[in-house]
Amino acid sequence: ASMNYFRFVEFHDQYGIIPVQNGRNLTLGTTVVPSHAPDDGSAAPDCITDGSDMASSPYFKSNHYPYSLTIELPQPSRISEINLATRLVNGSETAYKYTIEGSMDGQEYQTLIDGRNSWIVGFHILPVEDRSAYKFLRLNVFQIINVHNNHPATWADGIYEFTAFGFPL
């Protein structure tokens, strides 16, 4: 199954309904730097920006919690939306507790999305209200929780895709 979502669509007489992205895909093919090494069986961190978010796609899994994944954008950009696709294991319902931050210099970060109280499972559609420009984005994963019993579920960890949409400056 694919995990694409489009907030807007347009109708074209010849082609029918056309999905409209919330800006340019700013993260496609970018390098990802993890705070900790991948776990055994994990794909390389760059898999989260390869454009592939299918259940059969490679995913990043850390060997340490909490962990961070930092992405350097090709140029400073205004971020309009972030899509985060997380792994689901045989119907397990796990919620990620996370933040997403932005920075111009890679040193001082501003929180763009606070998902530490999130109970969303699987695919996250995250509008970004902050209109500042950012060169770096960082996903901080604090916990992965089984939503049925509130127990840690790091065994189900896996980030398929992190896609930031927006407008380069």
Task: Please describe what each predicted stretch is.
Residues 14-50:
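Predominantly extracellular/luminal regions of secreted and cell-surface proteins
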Residues 1-21, 52-111, 120-169:
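Aromatic, loop-rich ligand-recognition surfaces of beta-strand-rich domains
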Residues 115-117:
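Short beta-strand segments within Ig-like beta-sandwich modules, predominantly Fibronectin type-III
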